[in-house]
Amino acid sequence: YSLSGSFRVYGDERYDYVAVSLPEKLPYRSQMQINPSRIVVDIFGATSNTNWVTQLRSAREVRNTWYEQLEDDVLRVYIELAHPQHWGYRISYDTAGTRLLVRVKRQPTSMDIRKMNIAIDAGHGGLNSGASGVNSGILEKDYTLRISKELEKHLKKGGTRSVFMTRNTDTTLDMPDRILMLREADPDLLVSIHLNSSSRDTVQGTSTFYRYIGFRSLSEKILTRMLELKLSEFGNVGHFNFALSGPTEYPNCLVEVAFLSNPGDEKRILDPKFQKNVAKKIAEGIRDWLKENR
């Protein structure tokens, strides 16, 4: 087994960090926990030889850090957060491969939507057309872009300082490229817009999706507002294995507005007024979520 060394918890002007000294690169996995909010990292092949967990006051989001030897070769690191809401984290090794670094994003100082950096992903695009309308034959990629642009317009009109679009045109973008773009944009949150489809034309309704429990509340707030459009409820779906739900760096939510395969839903999707109202409800859901986290 590899013996762990000292831990160091500190912050800079943007992030907090938990650094774990190790003699070599070891595999790890992480998870978010809520009530209380924690990041938990399991390091495989590691046995504790740690005598120092130094915690500096420059760390503002990391409230406490400790470890537990789960098994002879599994070291679990607990990172307790200062706020209930997870704002994201990233795990990497330093260039020498001897220090596992957990970078923790702090809660923004203001919960005003105007001061947020919000990313919007219009699903599909270019060669990837997505689903098609059951009667009209419209393509998902075109209408996700229309709704995304309406959301961008609504947010900017409301004063949001920064809105990042993964695409503004009908262009082909694969998932790794989108993830790299989003990592560079470093948003406070991401909303991805899609239109659903089923082999049964009776299936209908709106839904939201998330992967990590720490990001669930954003999808809940958006779904609550979407249901005000008198759409059927298809539900809030967790543990969703979608590429853009995978990054842990920022809260994210996938919105499946309605079903293109259902004649009633399709008719509404075609309506420009409905597209505007969807954008408005998503923005209201974001505002509700920010208000809850003040």
Each language-model region and where it sits:
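Short linear recognition/processing motifs and adjacent strand/loop elements at protein termini
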Residues: Y1-A119, G126-N128, L139, Y143, ...
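Active-site-proximal helix/loop segments of hydrolytic enzymes
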Residues: V41, S110, S132-R294
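Substrate-binding/active-site groove segments that recognize
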Residues: D121-H124, T206-T208
